[in-house]
């Protein structure tokens, strides 16, 4: 029986029972952090780390993934992140993901810690090498971007549709000039 630690074998073999997990918006200055978990029904071509794909390609793959998988997308608001803390939100997300999917599945989270949640393995940069984690990465990123595009209409000066709430120079300049809005994470260093 292969384990999740047999990474080279996982790269060459599709595991129908593997749930890939990733998040997007973890380091954003505003808006939600999205966590996604994905169990693919079949091997899909073109999947890789969402950060390496164009926005158009991510959106195309998003549609393919949701039609060919069992998935879960969770959102943690900036208020939840400020109140509970990022680690607690991540831990809660991992627990909800485990509860959503059956226990006989294997869980692989992109990163270096499972935050103490038993049964969840981790691998740094898994989103670049494991299809299910790549799929989760795409689901989380596209979901985060859609939310920020929607919220940008109510907060036009912050240009969330462009910066997706990350700490770009232009975003920080707007914060310095106009202050923060209700979407900003007050527990983060914003300037």
UniProtKB/Swiss-Prot annotation:
Which ranges carry the RNase H type-2 domain?
A: 16-191
Q: What class of enzyme is it?
A: hydrolase
Q: Does the keyword Manganese apply?
A: yes
Please tell me where a divalent metal cation binds in this chain: 22-23, 110
Localization annotation: Cytoplasm
- InterPro entries for the chain: RNase_HII, RNase_HII/HIII, RNase_HII/HIII_dom, RNaseH-like_sf, RNaseH_sf
Catalyses which reaction(s): Endonucleolytic cleavage to 5'-phosphomonoester
SUPFAM superfamilies given in the database record: Ribonuclease H-like (SSF53098)
GO cellular component term, pick one: ribonuclease H2 complex
Q: What is this enzyme's EC? A: 3.1.26.4
Q: What is its main location?
A: cytoplasm
Keywords from the named record: Cytoplasm, Endonuclease, Hydrolase, Manganese, Metal-binding, Nuclease
Q: What is this protein called?
A: Ribonuclease HII
Q: Which organism is it from?
A: Campylobacter jejuni subsp. doylei (strain ATCC BAA-1458 / RM4099 / 269.97)
Gene that this sequence comes from? rnhB
């Amino acid at each position: 029986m292969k384990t999740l630690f047999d990474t080279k074998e996982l790269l060459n073999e599709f595991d129908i029972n593997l749930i890939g997990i990733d998040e997007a918006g973890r380091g954003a200055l505003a808006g939600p952090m999205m966590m996604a978990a994905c169990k693919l029904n079949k091997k899909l071509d073109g999947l890789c780390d969402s950060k390496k794909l164009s926005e158009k390609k991510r959106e195309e793959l998003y549609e393919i993934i949701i039609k060919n998988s069992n998935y879960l997308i969770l959102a943690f608001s900036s208020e939840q992140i400020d109140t509970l803390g990022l680690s607690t939100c991540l831990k809660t997300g991992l627990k909800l993901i485990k509860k959503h999917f059956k226990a006989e599945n294997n869980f692989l989270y992109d990163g270096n810690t499972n935050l103490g949640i038993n049964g969840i393995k981790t691998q740094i940069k898994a989103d670049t090498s494991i299809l299910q984690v790549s799929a989760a990465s795409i689901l989380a990123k596209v979901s985060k971007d859609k939310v920020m595009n929607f919220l940008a209409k109510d907060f036009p000066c912050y240009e969330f549709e462009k910066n997706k709430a990350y700490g770009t120079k232009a975003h920080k300049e707007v914060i310095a000039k106009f202050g923060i809005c209700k979407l900003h994470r007050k527990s983060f260093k914003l300037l």
